[in-house]
Amino acid sequence: MTKTYKYEDQLHFIQKSDDVKNLFIIKKGFVPNMNVEGHLFANDNLSKLLFDELKQFTDDPGSFLPALKQLANVAALPGIVKSSIALPDAHSGYGFSIGNVAAFDMDNCNSIVSPGGVGFDINCGVRLLRTNLLYKDIEPIKEQLVQKLFDLIPVGVGCQGKIPCDYGDLDNILEYGMDWSVCSGYSWAEDKEHCEDFGRMIQADPTVVSYRAKKRGLSQIGTLGAGNHYGEVQVSIYSNIYVVEEIYDEYSAKVMGIDRIGQVCIMTHSGSRGLGHQVASDALVDMENSLNKSKIKVNDKQLACARINSDEGKKYLKGMAAASNYAWVNRSVMTHLTRKAFEEVLKESADDLDMHVVYDVSHNIAKIEDHMVDGKLKRLLLHRKGSTRAFPPYHPLISADFQHIGQPVLVGGTMGTCSYVLTGTQLAMDLTLGSTCHGSGRTLSRNKSRRVLDYNEVLNNLKEKGISIRVASPKLVTEEAPESYKDVSEVVQTCHDSGISKKCVKLRPVAVIKG
């Protein structure tokens, strides 16, 4: 029988690091069977939110596990190395917390892959476009511009894409990713040079993706979708217009083509839609059925998993890669539609408007990477869920354009708050397996947001800030209000102070499209 600890007793397993700023260490014994420690990166204010969640659960256990328990349960999975890592935007999710990073040794035959460590919206991620426009150039036509974007980019649950696509096209999308969108005219050839993995995972195999998943994905190419992730509470999906408010690192920003306060940028956040959700759901069924056969013990049934080299593990990784390719194409088509919207309203070509991709990052993905573990270079399967790769300067897997500055990291804020561009660091490789935060992280559930926040008050606050808004559903106004989230600036500053990413640019929203 598992021993039950009081809240005060559980705190004895958590200590603050003397060596690394904003690091809390969760020692073995916090939950049963931990193979490694849990490492939480959070300042005192952000950590208090997670401790309060833990206390609430201890006093009154509910249907969800607090993020700290989930972090520790991941530390008990077979084959995990270094530590189970939670970033400052961590909050409770399905199996893994959102904001969790975990790596498994590819040379260990017991190591596992878990769909809960990626999430249901496989390769949900963010793409940033820059322009040569200043805010004064679009201010008189801002409403027209945001309406054109809203008209061209399908948003919301069940929305249908405008790109003609048959099952043959879909298989090519799943296999070739952005190479398909370049050949089909929906991407500029240079776009993929500024995408993580250059917009394609070569392990993808369309034949392992179920007919049901393909049917769901066929009509959703180039759609923004909605932000309700099954079994989890994540940031909503959006396409926002920003202006540069502050530049912290002028050299790095200039390399990215961002060099002026007031410069207009566009950020799109979306993923693999219903197709990725179905790939994850199918894999969970397979893995739940095989858990007894493989004799893998997990602390939480939501951590259903399979050995990496098992049939179930290989199938999931191939399907996840295919869904990731789909997500890159999805963001590419939305980039195409965004460029088209600007062209139609401003009567200039996207090329003349300098609408180049700054970068495209993944927030929910599993990848094979090489990292140092106990002084040895090891090949690992990295699970990043609600977290962002943050490789340092001169890392071989980042684009040539960014070798001197490190990988750009895109961190989205909420409906009325700023977003950030960061750069990766060597310390991230040492402390967080080359990872940093991805957003702000929810503090209120969607239901609670609708109960306690006033629709008109939220709209008025946005209006006072000069933010235009279009939403697929009115309920999103309260669900996605800034009050529902942690302070993204505090999250970003915590990562900056810990040295796992470096602040580069701050972006202020002037128009918001929510799905």
From Swiss-Prot:
UniProt xrefs under PANTHER family: RNA-SPLICING LIGASE RTCB HOMOLOG
Active site: 438
Cofactor detail note: Binds 2 manganese ions per subunit.
Binding site for GMP: 228-232, 363-364, 412-415, 419, 438-441, 514
Protein name per its UniProtKB record: RNA-splicing ligase RtcB homolog
Primary enzyme class: ligase
GO molecular function (one): metal ion binding
Cofactor: Mn(2+)
